[in-house]
């Protein structure tokens, strides 16, 4: 019984390796048919390195942080920040739903390729009237004259 506990304890410390998501357009190409499974995994790992998804997630996080910062400074209201964040979340959900479920390396079946590009979230922050906190350079120059 002690051996089983030690074995389970060792498994908890093993780092989790994320699965490689393979788009249908890449998995169904005739070029990959002649490759072995190891070569395909290597190719998919290279595809993962050049994947735009981590950059896209970082951009989303940066945008949300920017919204929070603008709200703290008083440039936008809580309602405006929440509305823009909701638009970002909804458009991200729509884009991931449009792309369909991603397949992993072990699965291999014929499928169709996607014909439409995935949607990118768009949120326009409405400009508010000038803030009373930060006067513009133009108003400073007028006061000096």
UniProtKB/Swiss-Prot annotation:
It holds the Pfam family FAM216B. InterPro entries: FAM216. Residues 92-121 are annotated as: Disordered. PANTHER family: FAMILY WITH SEQUENCE SIMILARITY 216 MEMBER A, PROTEIN FAM216B. Belongs to the FAM216 family. This is Protein FAM216B. It comes from Bos taurus (Bovine).
């Amino acid at each position: 019984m002690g051996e089983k506990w030690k074995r389970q304890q060792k498994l908890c410390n093993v780092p989790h390796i994320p699965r490689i998501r393979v788009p249908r357009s890449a998995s169904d190409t005739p070029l990959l048919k002649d490759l072995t499974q190891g070569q395909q995994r290597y190719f998919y790992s290279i595809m993962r390195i050049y994947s735009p998804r981590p950059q896209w997630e970082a951009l989303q996080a940066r945008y949300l942080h920017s919204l929070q910062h603008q709200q703290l400074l008083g440039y936008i209201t809580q309602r405006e920040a929440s509305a823009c964040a909701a638009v970002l979340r909804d458009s991200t959900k729509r884009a991931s739903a449009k792309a369909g479920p991603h397949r992993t390396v072990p699965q291999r079946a014929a499928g169709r390729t996607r014909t439409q590009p995935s949607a990118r979230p768009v949120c326009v922050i409405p400009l508010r009237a000038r803030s009373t906190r930060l006067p513009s350079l133009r108003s400073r120059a007028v006061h000096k004259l």
